[in-house]
């Protein structure tokens, strides 16, 4: 009885031990078989099948004793893709092919590749094409002398110079890659994109074939007629001629320059600038700084806000105008001559060497160098102060020429003792200046004086 119980006890322990060992072995096998998340293994491809060859033989004593030597209308099939050539070495053991002469590779209805010679690895699903390589994918054509096509990742790489043609867009680079599934390309070193008459040069460019949109990285330039765009981080849409520029970019159009932290540039249309925007017109000799600007290159009209400052240096003395908002309108007198009107509002501040002014709103006309101020304007000239409902100031090359005060005009002149003031008030007042000083004054309507 005791022996029987002892045997049952031992047998129970054996069963438990076997179960533990089985469970441990199962866990160990699972751990060994668990795939690595960071590595994507290439599957073993199906066999490469020889469909046809006019001649087939072996050369056991030659350079390729393991190869079937094929000649004449050679044709292979591998996982739905076809490879044809004039002659080939077929390595059946390694599932690979070396093809020569009029090599033509076809994959489905959208991709074909031609070259002078190629190596195809069925295990790695890799095609290495050399000499006069032409890859056609949908409406795109890639030309190069050295190209590797990875079927598993749908990636074509060239590394000895290549050209991608996409409709009117033509991209040239020393090195590049093209993804046939996403239809995105990357080009590096001496990159040049031609789109119609526009030319983009850069060292690194990402190109989205579906959107015809290029992303330039590093020092880049877009030349479009007389316009030149410089950027180090920009997106360019070849269909719409629109560019999004970041990282302190510049647009140059003949004598005009637009610079900003962020620019949205539209060829022959309205462009927008954000952050430290600087606009310079060298021909008209004026400039504008602000933190937000809309400017139409075709019409010459613009809108500026966020601390705008307009600077006119067309005369010997420079005029500075500051306000919350500014509007710029350009007018063409004839083909070669233009003038501008600057509307500034509110909280206007203006400064020249011989004149300072404040008002609620101001209009400056570059044609007659007239500055018209509205709503509580005040003008200072030396020791004289002019006030009124509206003030017009006309300027010469370097000084004030004429001032016209309309409505509740008041002139205050500080005397040499800095204590007393001469004052004249009237409905209208005209002041004529010479060398920055009042030479003659006229007060019209309800004149009152205090001396």
Predicted feature locations:
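Bacterial Sec-dependent N-terminal signal peptides
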Residues: 1-39
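N-terminal amphipathic/hydrophobic interface segments
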Residues: 31-451
């Amino acid at each position: 009885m005791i022996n029987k119980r002892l045997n049952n006890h031992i047998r129970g322990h054996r069963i438990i031990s076997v179960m533990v060992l089985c469970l441990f072995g199962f866990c160990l096998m699972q751990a060994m078989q668990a795939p690595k998340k960071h590595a994507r293994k290439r599957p073993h491809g199906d066999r490469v099948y020889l469909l046809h060859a006019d001649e087939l033989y072996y050369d056991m004593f030659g350079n390729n004793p393991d190869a079937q030597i094929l000649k004449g209308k050679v044709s292979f099939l591998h996982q739905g893709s076809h490879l044809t050539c004039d002659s080939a070495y077929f390595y059946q053991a390694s599932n690979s092919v070396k093809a020569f002469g009029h090599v033509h590779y076809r994959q489905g209805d959208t991709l074909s590749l031609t070259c002078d010679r190629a190596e195809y690895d069925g295990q790695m699903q890799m095609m290495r094409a050399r000499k006069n390589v032409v890859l056609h994918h949908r409406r795109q054509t890639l030309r190069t002398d050295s190209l590797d096509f990875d079927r598993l990742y749908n990636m074509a790489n060239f590394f000895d110079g290549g050209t991608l043609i996409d409709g009117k867009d033509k991209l040239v680079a020393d090195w590049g890659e093209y993804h046939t599934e996403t239809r995105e390309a990357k080009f590096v070193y001496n990159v040049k994109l031609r789109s119609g008459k526009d030319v983009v040069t850069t060292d690194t460019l990402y190109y989205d074939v579906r959107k015809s949109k290029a992303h330039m990285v590093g020092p880049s330039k877009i030349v479009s007629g007389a316009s030149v765009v410089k950027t180090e981080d920009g997106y360019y849409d070849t269909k719409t001629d629109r560019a999004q520029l970041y990282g302190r970019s510049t647009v140059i159009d003949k004598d005009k320059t637009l610079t900003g932290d962020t620019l949205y540039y539209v060829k022959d249309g309205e462009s927008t600038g954000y952050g430290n925007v600087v606009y310079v017109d060298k021909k008209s000799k004026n400039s504008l700084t602000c933190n937000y600007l809309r400017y139409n290159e075709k019409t010459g009209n613009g809108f500026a806000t966020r601390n705008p400052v307009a600077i006119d240096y067309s005369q010997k003395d420079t005029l500075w105008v500051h306000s919350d908002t500014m509007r710029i309108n350009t007018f063409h007198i004839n083909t070669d001559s233009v003038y501008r009107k600057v509307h500034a509002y509110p909280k206007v501040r203006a400064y020249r060497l011989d004149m300072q002014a404040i008002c609620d709103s101001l209009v400056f006309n570059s044609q007659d160098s007239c500055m018209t101020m509205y709503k509580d304007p005040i003008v200072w000239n030396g020791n004289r102060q002019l006030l009124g409902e509206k003030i017009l100031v006309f300027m010469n090359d370097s000084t004030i020429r004429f001032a016209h005060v309309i409505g509740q005009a008041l002139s205050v002149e500080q005397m040499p003792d800095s204590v007393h003031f001469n004052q004249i008030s009237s409905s209208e007042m005209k002041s004529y200046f010479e060398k920055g000083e009042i030479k003659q004054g006229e007060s019209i309507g309800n004149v009152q004086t205090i001396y």
